[in-house]
UniProtKB/Swiss-Prot annotation:
Gene Ontology CC: one annotated term: cytosol
Disulphide connectivity of cysteines: none
Gene3D superfamilies, per the entry: 3.40.140.20, Methylglyoxal synthase-like domain
Protein name (Swiss-Prot/TrEMBL): Bifunctional purine biosynthesis protein PurH
Family: Belongs to the PurH family.
SMART domains to which the protein is assigned, alphabetical: AICARFT_IMPCHas, MGS
GO biological process per UniProt: 'de novo' IMP biosynthetic process
PROSITE patterns the record matches: MGS
Cited InterPro entries: AICAR_Tfase_dup_dom_sf, Cytidine_deaminase-like, MGS-like_dom, MGS-like_dom_sf, PurH-like
Length: 521
């Protein structure tokens, strides 16, 4: 039974109402510093920990709760007579409920003006110590680190005579250990990232020890293949526009491949300002287009490769209305993603309950790192977030691109970034015309992209081509020109750049170098 609670929080969300409810249930309240003042100002009967222990707060608040009368009351096992006799001998009441959250270390180091001294002062000592003590003794002590759990604990106390069951206590304890591990991990990441221990700003983005924490969203039916087990995890702090924040409106449970392909589709479609549609198959765009609205963009994207679009993942960067829904509903689709769906659009898909509809807010989608596991290790890199600006482009041919060609080139370049290497993308009039992906030679990707366009009945005459990396020889360029391309955008950087540029001049096409490569593996 909960008779006494100790409350000490940095995040004071909902704490007054929670403490009042505890007091109404007859629970004695102990508290520290600012929390105690807040509760007292609200008219609640609260005892300061300093008065409770008979030992004042000291060292500018660094020592508040590190006292046997606090930790003895938390750690004593109620089922061991010798523990309870020791408490009685030293006049230590039990503390049955601990409500603590920690100094905002992560928020502090995120500030531009944060100094190392600021960071150090926001490393909580007493809080984690109490939390770990209570979590260790969870059979007898209820511990809350998250304000979201206030209501759950109160409801259980009211229903069970101020008692919280073991299952809830165990869940709350595991939450504490996860929280303190993340907290210590953030401190380690920060301190080991400092290149000059005297300067907060001198930080290596890749700390000597990398700690990362994720929380499980769900177990998956299987992994990439049926014989593989799998689960989906998300970052503890998830950017607003991240796929992991999806809201599923209808459809079957998402699979491992659904999630992976949906992320590729969503990240690609968000890069466009105009209404856009991206169709993904096996993590590669097989159709991308911009249009007047979602329905128009979808119609153009679907034209690129109707065969590959079968069973694909489709993403929009605008609301899906009835017209777009009716167009998509004519095809077999695994997942449809958009910022929102009109009621009429939802009604269209109500007759196709296997189609998974996902709503995700537009916005930044990824945290700082891109990760790839290798045997016994982890490759960590910054995101490929580079978008070339017009002033960074360099025309290297005698003929310059026309304004229309420039628009097509920039569109093609944006798409190529999301195609598996080696990538060749033909585009024109705001849509992909042919996509060559994932080939070991660039010339083969060029040939495949050309064949894809022919199979779809699309002309490549006057088209623009993007290559995610340089042309090592002129052969790839010759293939795209023979197919009908009149302008090319590529990074450059080959030892044979002069030969490739000369070939472009020979064909009288325009060529732009970006100086940026977009390998994608």
């Amino acid at each position: 039974m909960i008779k006494q609670a100790l409350i000490s929080v940095s995040d004071k969300t909902g704490i007054v109402d929670f403490a009042k409810s505890l007091s109404d249930l007859g629970v004695k309240l102990l508290s520290t510093g600012g929390t105690a003042k807040l509760l007292a100002d609200a008219g609640l009967p609260v005892t300061e920990v300093a008065d409770y222990t008979g030992f004042p707060e000291m060292l500018d608040g660094r020592v508040k709760t590190l006292h046997p009368k606090v930790h003895g009351g938390i750690l004593a096992r109620r089922d061991l007579p010798e523990h309870m006799q020791a408490l009685e001998a030293h006049d230590i009441p039990t503390i049955d409920l601990l409500v603590v959250n920690l100094y905002p270390f992560v928020a502090t180091i995120a500030k531009d003006d944060c100094t190392l001294a600021d960071a150090i002062e926001n490393i909580d000592i007493g809080g984690p110590t109490m939390l770990r003590s209570a979590a260790k003794n969870h059979r007898d002590v209820t511990v809350i680190v998250d304000p979201a759990d206030y209501a759950v604990v109160l409801d259980e106390m009211k229903a069970n005579g101020n008692t919280v069951g073991y299952a809830t206590n165990f869940r709350l304890a595991t939450k504490v250990f996860a929280h303190t591990a993340q907290y210590d991990g953030a401190i380690t990441n920060y301190l080991t990232s400092l290149t000059d221990e005297l300067k907060h700003g001198s930080r290596n983005p890749y700390p000597a020890t990398l700690n990362m924490a994720f929380e499980k969203v769900q177990d998956l039916r299987y992994g990439e293949n049926p014989h593989q087990s799998a689960a989906f995890y998300r970052d503890i702090v998830t950017p607003a526009g991240a796929l992991a924040n999806y809201r599923q409106l209808q459809g079957k449970e998402l699979s491992y491949n659904n999630i992976a392909d949906s992320d590729a589709a969503w990240e690609c479609v968000k890069t466009f300002d105009a209404p856009a549609c991206v169709i993904i198959k096996h993590a590669n765009p097989c159709g991308v287009a911009v249009g007047n609205d979602s329905a128009d963009a979808y119609a153009k994207a679907f034209q690129t490769d109707p065969t590959s679009a079968f069973g694909g993942i489709i993403a929009f960067n605008r609301e899906v209305d009835e017209a777009a829904a009716q167009a998509v509903a004519k095809q077999f689709v695994e997942v449809l993603i958009a910022p929102s769906f009109t009621d009429a659009a939802k009604q269209v898909f109500a007759a196709k309950q296997n189609v998974r509809l996902l709503e995700i807010a537009l916005g930044e989608g990824h945290n700082a790192f891109d990760l790839k596991r290798v045997g016994g290790g982890l490759l960590v890199q910054s995101l490929d977030a580079k978008n070339v600006q017009p002033h960074e482009l360099r025309v290297v041919t005698k003929r310059h691109p026309t304004p229309k060609e420039m628009d097509d080139l920039l569109f093609a370049w944006r798409v190529a970034k999301y195609v598996k290497s080696n990538a060749i993308v033909f585009c024109g009039n705001g849509m992909t015309l042919g996509v060559g992906a994932g080939q070991m030679s660039r010339v083969d990707s060029a040939r495949i992209a050309s064949i894809k366009a022919q199979n779809a009945g699309l002309t490549l005459a006057g088209s623009a081509v993007a290559s995610d990396a340089f042309f090592p020889f002129r052969d790839g360029l010759d293939v795209v020109v023979a197919a009908g391309a009149t302008c090319v955008i590529q990074p450059g950087g080959s030892v044979r750049d002069d030969e490739v540029i000369a070939a472009a001049d020979e064909h009288n096409i325009a060529m732009i170098l970006t100086g940026v490569r977009h390998f994608r593996h």
